[in-house]
Amino acid sequence: MRALSSKLQISFAFLLAMVHVASHLPKLMAQFPEDHFDRLDASAVVELAGTQRLTLQGDIASELVSGVDRFLLKQLDASVKDRRLNWPEPKADGGTYEEAIKELRSDYARRIGLVDSRVEATDWIIESPLSRIADDRGSSALASDDTLRIQRVRWPVLEGWEASGLLVIPKTIRFGVVLVPDASQMPENLCGVGQGSSTDALVLARAGGLVVIPQVASRHREARLGRAVMTDQEYLYRSAFVLGRHLLGYHVHQNMSAIDLLKKTIPDRPVMVAGWGEGGWIALATGVCDTRIDLTCVSGHFGPREKVWDQPIHRNVHGLLKHFGDAQLAAMIAPRRLVIDPVPGPTVTIAGDGGAPGNLMGPDLSQAKFETDLAQGLLGKWKLTDKIVLSGPAEGALERSSGISDAGLSRSLASLSSDIESELKKVSGYRDPIPQVAWGPLAAVETRRVAWLKQLDRWQQRTLDLIQYERDAHWKNLDTSTPEKFAASVEPYRKEFRDEIIGHWDLPKKPLMPRTRLVYEREKWRGYEVVLDVFDDVISYGVLLVPKSAEPISKRPCVVFQHGLEGRPTDTIVKDHPAYHDVSAQLAEQGYVVFAPQNLYLFTDRFRTLQRKSNLLGKTLFSTIIAQHEQIVQWLASRPEVDPSRIAFYGLSYGGKSAMRIPALVPEYCLSICSADFNDWVWKNASTSAPYSYVWTMEYEIFEFDLGRKFNYAEMATLIAPRPFMVERGHADGVAPDERVGLEFAKVRRMYAARLGLPDRTTIEWFNGPHTIHGVGTFEFLSKHLRHQPK
């Protein structure tokens, strides 16, 4: 038994070691010198026939990344005007404003993950300070005075997940409130207790509000599984994003569940939602999604959103800025009322440490005023501009606070009812906290944070367990009965993958303008740097290897070999890099034309912010990478030495990710080989049980919104079919265990062999080795399907 235990410990240690090696492979890649080109005589520096001479100097890969950054920033700036011009206007044949924005509301709800049905709650679950046992005062109240009492409560939201927080009960109930804390606050802080507190909840209760204060995801940071340091918010966001859910959606869900109960408790009374800082962000989203809310108060949050990419990553809503800045969200609350309280929000700086870096600052009064003017402008033709009001002065600075300003509260209460505001003014000391001595034990505050986090994490993991069935249902319309029916029925899925998951730039591409420069002169091949134009500011760059046996010109098969994370084309050509073993050069020596492109995933946070910027527009890194590859295959197909019907794709690691996505959307690639990456991709992204998961690592950009409900790697391989597809897999590769790889590949095998009747077009090679090119089975696969005998 001891021997078995020892073996298990050794196996687990080996597993973690391999995960460690895999996670640090990018660092090994980055350490290799950039300049691996031959030192050629000046007279030999010539361009490839049919191209212009490349004169660009310096690090072209760095310029490529910088150019894409400029391109994305321009697209973000342009989105402001696009959103304004595309906003619904009254039609000559009538129609209400609510009808005009109905689809926009549904689209926003989907983007923030409101895709699950809430549990019907019958009543609040009341907890006492001592776990539902009445205290020595004979009351289950956490605290009380002569105007109100405070209960600790829970309420069901989704099957298996409950919200928790405080319920502040006034002596006379005139309205209901969901008051959302900032992420630095516990519900008790809004009752005047502790550092960074406010008495907003007490003010609202003394005005007659039945106040619900939900627990929200905290900014608490810690190393997760001893690895990447991140907030509770990011920890939940990572899994949620891939599953088609979102942290913002969870908060909106629990607010809407609270409103369900408020409407049962006080069915004939108005309801408002309010919050400061992070609470303002959540309140705004709740006001958009729940039309039962009579008034929304957004404090310390409202302003332009074109720099959400620099904020904490849980603020990342895929496709947000295609339709929704804060102005559009504000306009969607109309014809109900919105009060914007333009006080500064929290100032937050989150260091990376493996998690995503992010900053929160402001907004200042001028930003809030600017966005408010935009919102009112959207409502002008609908004659609804009076539904949005700014509670503060039009000019000047406002004091920093930890809650809603007096002006914001006063304006909100007056907007609900002038009687409510006047009743508050009758209460002496309505901002006064409840004396600390009146509070019961507060030790449960941290316990509640952890319990809330763990319960929601368990809910997500249960969703992950079941998501395969959602995917299967999503693919029910695929028809494999004949090749023609397969081709027709798979196309809508390809379009969905292109438009909704990857994102497609609907922009005209520039002429190729190929520029080349000879950089390698070897016995069997020559190598050329290549630059192609894609969009304004966007280029494609790589190295083309041309076998000398192709001279005089003969049509050859071409292999596009894609490097991995933090890699460069030269890593695949020279110096026997431990991951690549000069695979591009090996293939050129076998007589293939080889192109090694530079992909965008280089320079750590520089490229990761490209993903953040892309996501806001409903795009991803691969939106731009695919546009680059479309130009690459167009140029390769035009080359006299390349057979356009035999252009193959082969990639390792992040290049393996590319091998699953690019050929699925670029049909000019006649086959695809995924090396050192293939696995149960959704599980690898969303699991908080497996040490292999990206939840624990520095790759905060890796997550793709709503992928899990629609596509895993087997489904991506289906988009590649009926073209040949292969997996190259080392047993010691730490990206995933063999069992997970085999499980997902079995689905691919079934599709090709059983459903399409093409068993010879797919295979997997298992070899004893790590995260590396093996170059045995894959070379045979290329030779077979490219109809080429190595020279």
Residue ranges and their predicted role:
Residues 158, 165-174, 194, 535, ...:
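Short beta-strand-to-loop junctions in surface cap/lid or active-site-entrance loops
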Residues 174-265, 302-314, 551-638, 683-688, ...:
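Cap/lid segment of the alpha/beta-hydrolase catalytic domain
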Residues 174-175, 207-210, 269-270, 291-295, ...:
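Loop/turn elements at helix/coil->beta-strand transitions in domains of secreted/extracellular proteins
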Residues 215, 299-300, 341, 598, ...:
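Alpha/beta-hydrolase-fold catalytic nucleophile elbow
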Residues 31-163, 243-250, 260, 291-294, ...:
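Alpha/beta-hydrolase-fold serine-hydrolase catalytic core, especially in secreted/extracellular enzymes
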Residues 1-12, 22-24:
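Bacterial N-terminal signal peptides that target proteins for export
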Residues 258-332, 634-708:
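Primarily recognizes the serine-hydrolase "nucleophile elbow" in alpha/beta-hydrolase
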